[in-house]
Design a protein with these regions (language model features):
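Exposed beta-sheet edge and beta->alpha loop/turn motif
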Residues: 17, 32-49, 53-58, 62, ...
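A short, amphipathic edge element
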Residues: 170-189
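N-terminal export leaders
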Residues: 7-11
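Secretory targeting signals
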Residues: 1-5, 15-20
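Juxtamembrane and targeting peptides
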Residues: 26-122
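Core segments of small alpha/beta cavity-forming domains
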Residues: 96-174
Length: 256
């Protein structure tokens, strides 16, 4: 097997959705970005929401002096999809997007109380919150929750490729129907690697079949390959009292 883990391939997963969205929107470029401030920050868009209730996001006690998760922690199995346990669903029942309207009442991720703990549980919660926040972002164009997750500098720069797409989505100009971001951990526990940890995983960035716009037009989303599980691993490094996470995948062009 000649496949190797590729940082650029991982960034390709992040940018694939934006590229597909903008390609699908090419015929729609005459549509103006809403009557409001759609060109402003997505956090001030109609899809933006106030932060989650404070009682749900009280910071846990952390031990930044510790360089690794406590050895006394039970060897719990975290194998499987990294799922966030709590969402704010007070807006009502979630409705996927259709040709007539964007997704409605999108559940808002609630930051786990143990997310900043220097433990395997803390790393798991960070990964789960990252997946949920990224899905919320590509659904609503609002990255307020995604900004609560620390990622490496290269990945943060790669996120800038989503800016134009986010403006379209947040302004109600165009939208995906029901995007899904899924990170599945394929081992029970992470493995120590240098100053951090690696966790074998698969990643799915499924942006769905269609992009719709406010003028009633529908354009198919080109396949990116990212809608199928991509093998790789999550990197986690505890720094500054939080977990910094990074996605690593095999090159999309490689056979695995």
């Amino acid at each position: 097997m000649t496949s190797v883990f590729n940082r650029r391939a991982a960034l390709g997963l992040l940018s694939a959705g934006s590229a597909a969205f903008l390609a699908a929107c090419a015929p729609l470029r005459s549509v103006k970005k809403s009557s409001g401030d759609s060109s402003s920050s997505s956090s001030s868009s109609p899809n933006s929401h106030s932060p989650e209730p404070s009682e749900e996001s009280v910071s846990p006690t952390v031990s930044p002096s510790s360089s690794s998760p406590a050895s006394s922690e039970p060897a719990k199995s975290y194998k499987g999809e990294a799922k966030l346990e709590k969402y704010d669903t007070s807006a009502g029942t979630y409705e996927p997007g259709t040709s007539e309207h964007p997704p409605r009442n999108v559940p808002k991720p609630i930051k786990p109380a143990n997310m900043n703990e220097n433990s395997v549980a803390g790393l798991y919660s960070t990964i789960a919150f990252y997946a949920a926040s990224f899905q919320y972002f590509v659904t609503t164009g609002d990255r307020q929750y995604l900004d609560q997750v620390k990622v490496d500098e290269e990945e943060e720069e790669g996120m800038s490729e989503y800016d134009e797409m986010a403006q379209y989505i947040a302004g109600g100009v165009a939208w995906f129907e029901n995007p899904k971001i899924v990170i599945t951990l394929t081992t029970d526990q992470p493995t120590k690697s240098g100053s951090g940890y690696t966790w074998p995983s698969t990643v799915v960035f499924d942006y769905g079949k269609n992009v719709h716009n406010a003028q009633g037009q529908t354009v198919p989303v080109p396949s990116t390959g990212a809608e199928k599980p991509q093998k790789g691993y999550m990197k986690g490094k505890y720094t500054g009292g939080v977990w910094e996470v990074t996605i690593m995948t095999y090159d999309l062009s490689d056979d695995s």
